[in-house]
Amino acid sequence: EFAKIYSNVSSHLDQGMSLLESQYPFLNELSGKNLFERWYGNSRKLGVAFAHADPSMRLKWFGPEMSAKSSITARQMETWAHGQEIFDALGVKRTAHDRIKNICHLGVATFGWSFTNRGLKVPHHIPYVRLISPSGQIWEWGDSVSPSSIKGKASEFAEVVTQVRNVQDTRLASEGAIAKKWMKIAQCFAGKPENPPAKGSRFTVPRENFGV
């Protein structure tokens, strides 16, 4: 089934369609509530399948194959990141939870990818990352004596590496040239290099704007 979908999507992409447009044929004109119900039902099935999967099992995807564990983390990241767009559009402040640690870890793990994907030389040393979790715990990656560091809220770090916020719209403290460069190009997802949103362009719309 996946091989068929992959073949169709690849063919549409070769014809110049966007990834979004390439999905229309197999969605069979589903939209609105019907599309949501299809997505929700399939997400439950996917959750059950992942719960019983061997974490090391290799899974095919539109990009390179990945382990089930990596695929689970990637799906969580994508759902969280695109979900932020919904919170922003509806003017709802999101409540963060410590499950966001998986996304922060993926952000750190893709440090090298953020540079390689743009044809840039990967720095020898990864910055020290010290984040405050939603529950108040301290999460750390890297060596605390590193000349470069990133410190701040875990939720804001996740927003930057998933490119739902410009780093200048957060209170993350980036020290050192490597850390500052990384936060300008951070990309924890696969695909061609994507630029983060422009400063001030992504935010949660104030509720009063809805006139209700």
Spans of features found by a protein language model:
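Amphipathic alpha-helix face/heptad-repeat signature
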Residues: L35-N42, S71-R75, I103, S146
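Short, contiguous alpha-helical
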Residues: E1-Q15, F62-N117, F157
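C-terminal interaction segments
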Residues: S10, D14, E21, V145-V212
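Internal, glycine-rich beta/alpha segment that forms the wall or movable "lid"
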Residues: P55-G63
